[in-house]
């Protein structure tokens, strides 16, 4: 309808118009930028194993580091083998501090230690990794709720973003993942990964419409 009203017939202009319409649907008139204020601002990253949470955290850490911000990463996925080691690599690349414990430690304890490491140190952003064991759904969801309660209690004034990471190639499975994680966390944004292939991430419109 918009194309007809504007008398758009050129395919390139039509593509641009369509892209803007889709962007408007996702933005919904709100600011799509991450809200980062308070010392520290918290960005909690959630999602099932294998979707790219660790890589996402590394990229966000690198982005804020390049902006001159002081960043700390909390390695709270203590269950997946090599999760902590992968974050060590990313934190070294970005030049940011990593707070960790041994594999199998209480994730909430890692978050608590990370908060204490930030207090009084002028840390701008605390990035929190989390586990993604959806096959153990009940324990995972309770764990996420516990982590958020600690963040809310210890850092009441700072901004808190909860980003759900979804693999763009998974289609309808991503909708189900969004539903299940929304039961445990107040998701503020979605990160789509693996868009370098044929997947274009159209599933976000279904998620936006439903949730």
Language-model features and meaning:
Residues 131-133:
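Short glycine-rich anion-binding loops that position phosphate/pyrophosphate groups of nucleotides
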Residues 106-121, 135-211:
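Conserved catalytic-core segment of NTP-binding enzymes
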Residues 53, 77, 129, 167, ...:
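Acidic active-site catalytic centers that drive phospho-/nucleotidyl reactions
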Residues 8, 12, 81, 138, ...:
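Non-catalytic, surface-exposed connector residues within folded enzymatic/regulatory domains
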Residues 1-76, 83-119, 123-128:
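Primarily NTPase-proximal linker/entry elements flanking Walker-type ATP/GTP-binding cores
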């Amino acid at each position: 309808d918009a194309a007809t009203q504007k008398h758009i017939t050129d395919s390139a202009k039509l593509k641009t118009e369509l892209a803007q319409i889709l962007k408007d649907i996702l933005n919904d008139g709100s600011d799509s930028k991450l809200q980062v204020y308070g010392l520290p601002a918290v960005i909690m990253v959630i999602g099932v194993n294998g979707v790219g949470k660790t890589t996402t955290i590394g990229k966000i850490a690198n982005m804020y580091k390049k902006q001159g911000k002081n960043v700390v990463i909390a390695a709270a996925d203590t269950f997946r083998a090599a999760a902590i080691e992968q974050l060590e690599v990313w934190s070294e690349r970005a030049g940011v501090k990593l707070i960790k414990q041994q594999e199998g430690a209480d994730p909430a304890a890692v978050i608590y230690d990370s908060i204490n490491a930030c207090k009084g140190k002028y840390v701008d952003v605390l990035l929190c990794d989390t586990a993604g064991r959806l096959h153990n759904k009940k324990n995972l969801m309770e764990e996420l709720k516990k982590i958020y309660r600690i963040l809310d209690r210890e850092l009441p004034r700072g901004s808190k973003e909860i980003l759900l990471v979804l693999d763009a190639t998974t289609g309808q499975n991503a909708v189900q993942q969004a539903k299940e994680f929304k039961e445990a966390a107040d998701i503020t944004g979605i990160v789509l990964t693996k868009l370098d292939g044929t997947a274009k991430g159209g599933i976000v419109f279904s998620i936006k419409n439903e949730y």
